[in-house]
């Protein structure tokens, strides 16, 4: 009789142990389940908001430069992390396509950052302007790569509409910027002289191999091949000659008139044409 009782108790212990092991195994499996890309990016956004809501008014310029650098680094680290995982998980053909896209984005970002920094004219604000632009563009690109990775993993990934607006504004293409300036802008009515910004395929002075050509009546002809930097508000060109460099800037001034500046250095583009 005692043997039967002991056997029964032993069986109960075995069953309980199996159930506990099963529960523990299930719990461990759930704990080891990778975090969704949606949640991962949401956490980065929370950290980003902390920077956005910092007490900027109490900071000196040097501290603002450092803080914007850290803010940019937050998104750059996440971008690199996503790219590392994408490199491992994409098929070879798609990886090659995304790599080409990524290289084009890096080139575009570098030109944007240059263009933003130039607006400080070499002042102490330059680093902050460059960091802000790099951060905004990197944040936008992070969402693109996050979407790619979520797709590979068959996860849902939704970009809130407000964030999507910010993303669209952060990374305009060079083509979109040229379209803002497209046209023939008269600066001397008597001579009919103007600054022309035209698609190369329809331009009488089109530069071979380019998409956009910029020309001045009786003056220089440049193209998108000469773009040195740009923002959503301006385009800066650089043309290297044997004994000097020529710089040009295309923008709308404070009166919303097209302005085309020229000089032999970034800080001295003093030869300015203003079109009506």
Predicted regions and their residues:
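Short beta-strand segments that buttress and anchor functional surface loops
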Residues: 186-187, 213-216, 235-242, 260-263
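N-terminal alpha-helical modules
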Residues: 27-172
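Bacterial N-terminal signal peptides that target proteins for export
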Residues: 2-13
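Short, exposed beta-strand-loop hairpins at the edges of beta-sheets
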Residues: 248-269
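Short, surface-exposed coil-to-beta transition loops
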Residues: 113, 128-129, 191-192, 198, ...
